[in-house]
Amino acid sequence: VSDGQGEGHERTVLLGKHADRAVLESAAAGRGWRRAAISTAGHGEMEQVAWQAAGAFVLYSEVHLLGHRVVRVTGESEAAVAEALGAVRDAVPTVSPDDLLDVLLAMPPAESTQMIRALNGLRAADIWNCANGRRQPADPRYADAVERAVRHPERQVVRALVEAVGDLMAVRPGLEVPVLALRDADGPARDVIEDFAGFCDAAG
């Protein structure tokens, strides 16, 4: 996974379902951003386009496995990162991790397909942090979202949650706790939780 170059500040957003990559590329060209790198999608890989903006590195990635497109902006200056991210948001519809957490914490609960997409989105948003082992600041909303989703009555939601926790717990420690607490409980995804608990036992 390519994550661009050295950074002091970083912001990540996902593109909305109907965002047009061509519009983003046109906006980048219009702002004079220099195309920095591109990789061709292959099996299990991501298609990526990168630009060098004024004081910032902008990386667009299509995370095919998770069904999301991500833009990560890094730079030494918080202002430069904010400016480049603002240009992205002006060009195309975006979704932030805050938006995804809102879906997972909604009352009444969101539809299962929306919850699964939100869980996959959180995985995509943290994909570089997971690759680099870069721990993230504590955010209690993540644990609250896990607590909510692990008790969902639909198996596919719990499976998506367990897969997300498996990715994220290295950079957001403690997310596995609500899952492991249900290892002996009956439920539609008991086997999924048992398998995850066994993985944690082996890893620990």
Region locations from a protein language model:
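Short Lys/Arg-enriched alpha/beta "domain-start" segment
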Residues: V1-L59, V63-L65, A80
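Surface-facing alpha-helical segments and adjacent helix-coil boundary elements at the starts of domains
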Residues: H43-L105
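Amphipathic alpha-helical scaffolding segments comprising HEAT/armadillo-like alpha-solenoid repeats
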Residues: T94-A106, W128-A149, R172-R183
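HEAT-repeat alpha-solenoid elements in large eukaryotic scaffold proteins
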Residues: P108-A125
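Hydrophobic core positions within HEAT/HEAT-like alpha-solenoid repeats
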Residues: I116-N120, L161-E163, E194
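Structural signature of alpha-helical solenoid repeat scaffolds
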Residues: N120-I127, G166-D167, G198
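Eukaryotic acidic, Ser/Thr-rich intrinsically disordered low-complexity regions
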Residues: V179-G204
